[in-house]
Swiss-Prot record:
Belongs to the AB hydrolase superfamily. MetX family. This is Homoserine O-succinyltransferase. It comes from Teredinibacter turnerae (strain ATCC 39867 / T7901). GO terms for biological process: homoserine metabolic process; methionine biosynthetic process. Its main location: cytoplasm.
Amino acid sequence: MPDSIPANSVGLVTPQLMQFDEPLALACGRTLDSYQLMVETYGTLNASRTNALLICHALSGHHHAAGYHSMDERKPGWWDAYIGPGKPLDTNKFFIVSLNNIGGCHGSTGPVTPNPSTGQPWGGDFPTLRVRDWVHSQARLADALGIQKWAAVVGGSLGGMQAMRWSLEYPDRVGHCVVIASAMKLSAQNIAFNHAAREAILTDPDFHDGNFLSHSTVPKRGLSTARVIAHLTYLSDDGMGQKFGRELRSGSFEQGTEEPVEFQIESYLRYQADSFSKVFDANTYVLMTRALDYFDLAREYGDDPVEAFKQAQCKYMVISFTSDWRFSPERSREIVNALIRADRDVVYGELESDFGHDAFLIPNQPRYWDLLTSYMSQIEVAD
């Protein structure tokens, strides 16, 4: 818990649960008759409603992007290092909106919330989702908040995919699109990692086809293993070497010692997986990794990303990190090259980092801070 709230923090924040009663037709062919979104906002919406900025979260993210829910909260929101007064996403300038997407497990309608037709948690019966479903629900959220056009839509990883989809689905409602550590579609290797993670969950005896809550069980082992698989892809070899090397947590290699040896990296992964399995839902993990796999920005444009980006009207900023092998700089360059060929305005930054894919979340990176600050400061908003 903080001893006091830092001066550059958004401070204590209260999430709000927003109700939407207009049916939402999903890409899978099913419909949500109604749904709820858990939302947090930071800063003040100006009189002209031109300073609104949307944050789209990644796979394990949620609405709590900045500030504290109480003085007892141990850590601030997941992107607190970059959101707040005087920070790159400056709340003195922007009205920032962050939400937990449909299918999430932090308050929005999803597998852990009641299915209106049964009164029981949706569980494994929750509809399959696509990135465009999230974008359409976010557009409804913008309408409810009285926001006709976002000054910017910002997202990292899966959030970057949402930002790009926004620029195509609602081209006249996005001023700037900030895409960080993302891609226009997953590689076969990325799909394989997601498959391995899902298999760990789906084959856990406690999963019960996604209806584990009705069996009073939790597929903790499967979800923990899935998290370990994913977490490995978020780190880099250099980063793990610098942080953990071959240091031991317990045990010894001394001759005559039979005690099991545990490396620091093993202990770290086990701790992270155990923590994750206590706060995340297995069905949500399955839903969101499938949405990742199914995303293909150019599919409906003849598999031509140039043709896809010709639909857009906004300006773009694309950022990648050299040690990110999950969403490598090559994937970001593909986005940039397509934007250039589509004659769209784009700024690209490729940053040196040892933090792997997680770099977009890590604080205390001066070049990342400066790049974001420089771009965001140039976004014009009316008084």
